[in-house]
Regions:
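Extracytoplasmic beta-rich repeat domains
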Residues: 12-36, 63-78, 101-126, 151-175, ...
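Structural signature of WD-repeat beta-propellers
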Residues: 46-47, 86-87, 133-134, 184-185, ...
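Loop/turn-rich, solvent-exposed surfaces of beta-rich toroidal or solenoidal domains
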Residues: 217-232, 236, 240-275
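C-terminal closing repeat unit and adjoining cap/tail of repeat-based domains
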Residues: 263-311, 317
Length: 317
């Protein structure tokens, strides 16, 4: 179900139940994968492989596309292009206006991987799309035709534990100017030239979270609960702050960061949320939302919105 709510008080505006093509399909359930917005339309992907374009104001269905394969990743959209990635490592480019398939690319998939995945990055200005696959591959495409441009494996030869041996990429890659920034689950954070695929710098940082870029800096929350500030152009570490976590933290995960009102917001999956100085890494304050959270917060008009594991929305000024 996709639901639109008012930002100021949370009141529902509309909701739309997205149904599979095969009505009695109860296998992979009706779990949603994610949504994207291009300024005109809302796009939603679902666990049963459906891609939907909806009217923003009413939720009315405009078109739908069936991938015939489960989706666990939010789509990416810019201008009139929509990029969708399925769990079998297939990247599909659709026309956002009509839902017509433009091109498709498929690579090998890993038998053992992580739940979810990374949404593709897309620059309409450069006509380049960058997708991260669960086999550890980062690949760039000419967005208009699907022609592969270059690829890089985000796998460290120094993997030290069983989790690091999982090659899946969960952190969304980021296109920033003429560079791509991408992080793998197996101790690799890279800056890559967007046009050539040449590696600019690399650091041994493992994260399942999309880094946050602000000006000349990049902020990364590692899987070891370390919030790290780096110089974007060189990869040099400016500061490193370990979040306060309990000694026994099995099952706990790090979430974020996002930058809001000159503070970095980072969280733990048990509901502890921290405001941190982007200049020094000092903790400015914290709250406990008293619920488990699994998704990075969203910032809108000075409001920080958390989604709990029970599908509740929590909004904070």
């Amino acid at each position: 179900v996709v639901t639109a709510r008012r930002l100021d008080d949370g009141r529902e505006i509309w909701h739309k139940r997205l149904k599979p093509v095969i009505k009695d399909d109860k296998g992979i359930a009706l779990k949603g994968a994610g949504i994207a917005y291009n300024g005109q339309r809302l796009f939603a992907t679902t666990g049963f492989g459906g891609v939907f374009a909806l009217e923003m104001k009413t939720g009315k269905e405009i078109w739908r596309y069936d991938t015939e394969m489960p989706i666990r990743i939010a789509p990416t959209t810019e201008n009139n292009r929509l990029l969708v990635q399925t769990i079998d490592n297939t990247l599909i480019a659709l026309d956002a206006l009509s839902g017509k398939e433009i091109w498709k690319y498929k690579t090998t998939a890993e038998a053992t991987t992580l739940v979810g995945g990374a949404s593709p990055a897309y620059s309409s200005e450069e006509d380049v799309a960058v997708a991260a696959f669960n086999n550890g591959e980062l690949r760039a495409f000419k967005a208009s035709t699907g022609t592969p441009l270059w690829s890089e494996m985000l796998i460290s030869p120094k993997r030290t534990n069983s989790l690091a041996n999982i090659t899946a990429i969960k952190a969304n890659p980021i296109i920033d100017g003429d560079k791509v920034f991408a992080a793998g689950h197996s101790d690799v954070l890279m800056a890559i030239d967007l046009r050539t695929g040449k590696k600019i710098w690399e650091r041994e940082i493992s994260t399942s979270n999309q880094p946050w870029i602000a000006g000349k800096f990049m902020y990364v929350l590692s899987d070891n609960f370390e919030l790290i500030a780096l110089q974007k152009d060189t990869g040099k570490v400016v500061w490193n702050k370990k979040l306060p976590v309990p000694e026994h933290n099995a099952g706990l995960s790090a979430i974020g960061p996002v930058l809001a009102n000159n503070s970095l917001i980072a969280a733990l999956s048990d509901g502890h949320v921290f405001a941190i100085s982007p200049y020094t890494g000092a903790i400015l304050g914290f709250i406990n939302v008293d619920d488990e959270i699994g998704l990075s917060p969203v910032i809108a008009d000075g409001v920080v919105i958390f989604t709990t594991n029970d599908a509740d929305l929590l909004a904070y000024k």
